[in-house]
Swiss-Prot record:
HhH domain location: 48-77
GO CC terms: chromatin; chromosome; chromosome, telomeric region; condensed chromosome; condensed nuclear chromosome; cytoplasm; cytosol; lateral element
Function in brief: Plays an important role in homologous strand exchange, a key step in DNA repair through homologous recombination (HR). Binds to single-stranded DNA in an ATP-dependent manner to form nucleoprotein filaments which are essential for the homology search and strand exchange. Catalyzes the recognition of homology and strand exchange between homologous DNA partners to form a joint molecule between a processed DNA break and the repair template. Recruited to resolve stalled replication forks during replication stress. Also involved in interstrand cross-link repair.
GO molecular function term, any single one: ATP-dependent activity, acting on DNA
Entry keywords, A to Z: ATP-binding, Chromosome, Cytoplasm, DNA-binding, Nucleotide-binding, Nucleus
Source species of the chain: Gallus gallus
Gene Ontology annotations of biological process type: cellular response to camptothecin; cellular response to hydroxyurea; cellular response to ionizing radiation; chromosome organization involved in meiotic cell cycle; DNA damage response; DNA recombinase assembly; DNA repair; DNA strand invasion
Tissue: Expressed at high levels in lymphoid and reproductive organs.
Subunit relationships: Forms linear homooligomers, giving rise to a RAD51 nucleoprotein filament, which is essential for strand-pairing reactions during DNA recombination.
Residue numbers binding ATP: 127-134
InterPro entries: AAA+_ATPase (IPR003593), DNA_recomb/repair_Rad51 (IPR011941), DNA_recomb/repair_Rad51_C (IPR013632), DNA_recomb/repair_RecA-like (IPR016467), DNA_repair_Rad51/TF_NusA_a-hlx (IPR010995), P-loop_NTPase (IPR027417), RecA_ATP-bd (IPR020588), RecA_monomer-monomer_interface (IPR020587)
Protein's cellular compartments: Nucleus; Cytoplasm; Chromosome
Protein name: DNA repair protein RAD51 homolog 1
Region (Disordered): 1-23
């Protein structure tokens, strides 16, 4: 029998659990902040106390009706509710040990990533077409709904698709493999198609509001950079493109920090055409430059192997050694290579 997967809204959790989740913005009213000002913050896209506490003062001043004195008071009250000072490495280590990892569907790939895709940070998948980026995203959208003891994140998935490659049929095939109810799995995936870079950013404001209402474990953006290649062209617009991209990635990082979701973005590659390319073993590099390199916590390079096998290499990570693993793309999602 297919297992049912349903998640309760995070807002009506017990007081004990609430200390771990983000604080709803309404908490500021209890701290003496005017209800109208709280409403203005919410309309501007701030749905949690954390999002306000982490925001620079000039961002709050851009909100109509928020004066400098009000901004100072709001930030002071938010800082009291959100710990933002120094902590010992021991405490931080303890918090890190509680981080959930979401299985990729392949034992070899999970071993390479020391458990799976990490929540609370950005993982970037880049590679040529047909290397398994989108297939891995589809598999993760289902595995994140599994119970924690089965390698899941016990939460919903959010999928922002900029290339029109999302296929619900793939999710149903993966759900069947894990014995989950297909209709529940589809209900737990919030899907949006991104049409341009401004719309792509706007969707993150909606994502923030939805995450404040319900428990999400994963946010996928496939692909994070495709629309930037078409909306901005030529060297003349490079600076504007990188600034817009940096702002988008900063918002993703905030969502990962605030809600503890795993953020997975896919990226395309570009062929190097400079002199150094002649001596490089693989003359392809991910697009987005240093901006995306610094924003991603873990960068995974996917390339084709023989037949349906693919190879994943850790390109950059603060804690994982540089290594490779083989995986396969099967009818029921990402799995282990038969070889």
């Amino acid at each position: 029998m297919a297992m049912q997967v349903q998640f309760e809204a995070s807002t009506d959790t017990s007081a004990e659990e609430e200390s771990f989740g983000p604080e709803p913005i309404s908490r500021l009213e209890q701290c003496g902040i005017n209800a109208n000002d709280v409403k203005k913050l919410e309309e501007a896209g701030y749905h949690t106390v954390e999002s306000v506490a982490h925001a620079p003062k000039k961002e709050l001043l851009n909100i109509k009706g928020i004066s400098e004195a009000k901004a100072d008071k709001i930030l002071a009250e938010a800082a009291k509710l959100v710990p933002m000072g120094f902590t010992t490495a021991t405490e931080f280590h303890q918090r890190r040990s509680e981080i959930i990892q979401i299985t990729t569907g392949s034992k070899e790939l999970d071993k390479l990533l020391q458990g799976g895709i990490e929540t609370g940070s950005i993982t970037e998948l880049f590679g040529e077409f047909r290397t398994g980026k989108t297939q891995l995203c589809h598999t993760l959208a289902v595995t994140c709904q599994l119970p924690i003891d089965r390698g899941g994140g016990e939460g919903k998935a959010m999928y922002i698709d900029t290339e029109g490659t999302f296929r619900p049929e793939r999710l149903l095939a993966v759900a069947e493999r894990y014995g989950l109810s297909g209709s529940d799995v589809l209900d737990n995936v919030a899907y949006a198609r991104g049409f341009n870079t401004d719309h792509q950013t706007q969707l993150l404001y909606q994502a923030s509001a939805m995450m404040a209402e319900s428990r999400y474990a994963l946010l996928i953006v496939d692909s994070a950079t495709a629309l930037y290649r078409t909306d901005y062209s030529g060297r003349g617009e490079l600076s504007a493109r990188q600034m817009h991209l940096a702002r988008f990635l900063r918002m993703l990082l905030r969502l990962a920090d605030e809600f503890g979701v795993a953020v997975v973005i896919t990226n395309q590659v570009v062929a190097q055409v400079d002199g150094a390319a002649m001596f490089a073993a693989d003359p392809k590099k991910p697009i987005g430059g240093n901006i995306i390199a610094h924003a991603s916590t873990t960068r995974l390079y996917l390339r084709k192997g023989r037949g349906e096998t693919r190879i994943c290499k850790i390109y950059d990570s603060p804690c994982l050694p540089e290594a490779e693993a083989m995986f396969a793309i099967n009818a029921d999602g990402v799995g282990d290579a038969k070889e």
